[in-house]
């Protein structure tokens, strides 16, 4: 019922409305998370984030291309380690998966071409940026869309889907577009809920965070760390993880998560396809 028409006889004027979200490229609610470069040299294996290459507040495409070329000819570069998670499994503070199930979601991906390699670099940048700005996020997404237009394969589609979803999550969580000037990809729901809870009262946070964001399956423990025996693999290979502390890398502090990443990196069997 239109209350304006009921009391005045004048119908309410209809204004055209733009959709707030766009249709996802990849139909399944799964995203590529915790993307880190893997480099190995003799008895040392390192998983680390890609450097955030910014110029004048936006993504520096020329530096990114130079970095991709370096990785293509590198003798130590093995690929990118990553985990595929559903929206409902990424609880921000923890991962709602049993360790043996999570282990099946983690793998090392060796991109077969420069397009997919650059998409992985952009994914790692997006998760490991210390300070997010709308200009940087939008420039990174624009570059990812351009890469996909050059190589529209299913793996590029999935990586672009993940970048779009993570970018929308960042814009929503850090309130970079309060006016909602343009439709965007749907973001991760648990991060939107986390931001709403963090903005509430102390009492509400104490009540709601354990309900929605804590799981005893793979929880993050900032005090947990590997000892020297755990850092060294069976073949005497030392493994280290380096990443930027952001809300998207909190899972890497969990000992069970780091252990799975270590196992996958030391296996030495990267795959050349994300989706088969």
Swiss-Prot record:
Q: Which InterPro entries match?
A: Herpes_UL7
Q: Where in the cell is it found?
A: Virion; Virion tegument; Host cytoplasm; Host Golgi apparatus
Highest taxon, organism lineage: Viruses
Keywords recorded for this protein, A-Z: Host cytoplasm, Host Golgi apparatus, Virion, Virion tegument
Cystine residue pairs = none
Q: Which GO terms describe its cellular component?
A: host cell Golgi apparatus; viral tegument
One Pfam annotation reads: Herpes_UL7
This chain's function reads: Plays a critical role in cytoplasmic virus egress. Participates in the final step of tegumentation and envelope acquisition within the host cytoplasm.
The record's similarity note reads: Belongs to the herpesviridae cytoplasmic envelopment protein 1 family.
The protein, known as: Cytoplasmic envelopment protein 1
């Amino acid at each position: 019922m239109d209350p304006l028409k009921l009391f005045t006889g004048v119908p309410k004027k209809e204004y055209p409305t733009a959709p707030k979200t766009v249709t996802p490229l990849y139909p399944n609610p799964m995203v590529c998370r915790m993307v880190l470069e893997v480099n190995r040299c003799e008895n040392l294996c390192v998983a680390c984030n890609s450097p955030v290459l910014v110029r004048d507040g936006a993504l520096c495409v020329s530096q990114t291309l130079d970095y991709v070329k370096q990785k293509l000819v590198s003798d130590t570069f093995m690929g990118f380690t990553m985990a595929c998670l559903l929206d409902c499994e990424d609880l921000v503070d923890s991962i709602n998966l049993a360790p043996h199930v999570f282990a099946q979601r983690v793998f090392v991906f060796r991109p077969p071409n420069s397009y997919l390699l650059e998409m992985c670099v952009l994914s790692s940048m997006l998760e490991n940026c210390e300070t997010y700005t709308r200009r940087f996020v939008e420039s990174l997404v624009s570059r990812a869309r351009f890469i996909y237009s050059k190589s529209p394969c299913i793996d590029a589609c999935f990586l672009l889907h993940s970048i779009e979803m993570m970018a929308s999550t960042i814009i929503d969580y850090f309130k970079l577009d309060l006016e909602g000037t343009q439709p965007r990809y749907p973001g991760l729901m648990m991060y939107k809920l986390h931001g709403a809870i963090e903005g509430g009262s102390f009492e509400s946070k104490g009540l709601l965070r354990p309900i929605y964001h804590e799981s005893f399956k793979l929880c993050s423990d900032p005090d947990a760390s590997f000892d020297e025996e755990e850092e060294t693999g069976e073949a005497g290979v030392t493994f280290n993880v380096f990443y930027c502390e952001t809300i998207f890398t909190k899972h890497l502090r969990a000992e069970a998560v780091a252990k799975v990443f270590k196992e996958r990196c030391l296996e030495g069997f990267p795959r050349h396809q994300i989706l088969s």
